[in-house]
Amino acid sequence: IPGVGFGTFANEGATGXTYLKVDYIDLFLVHWPIAAEKAIGVSNWTIEGLEKENILPEAYSPLGIESNFKXGGYTLAQVLIAXGLSIQLTDXXYXAVNK
């Protein structure tokens, strides 16, 4: 993947084929607002900036929900790597993960 720096992707008519030889780019993570792709990452935008541009964020923060796992007897680290280990989550613990 070629390096894409400030200003190199916002050119008029820029497409995924220009840089990656694909039909389109499904997700292009950036740290500044551009409208050249179907979806952008917004890791350092403010809520006010997102609202101004009518962008609805989707958040993923498993480390922020520790209280959901206290009753199950597992640490957050155990739950996060459970897919690669033999830990079996109960239905109640699995439901807590999906809150």
UniProtKB/Swiss-Prot annotation:
Its EC number is 1.1.1.72. Keywords: NADP, Oxidoreductase. GO terms for molecular function: glycerol dehydrogenase (NADP+) activity. Transmembrane segments: none annotated. It comes from the Eukaryota. InterPro entries: NADP_OxRdtase_dom_sf. Signal peptide: none annotated. It is an enzyme of class 1 (oxidoreductase). It catalyses: glycerol + NADP(+) = D-glyceraldehyde + NADPH + H(+). Belongs to the aldo/keto reductase family. This is NADP(+)-dependent glycerol dehydrogenase. It comes from Aspergillus niger.
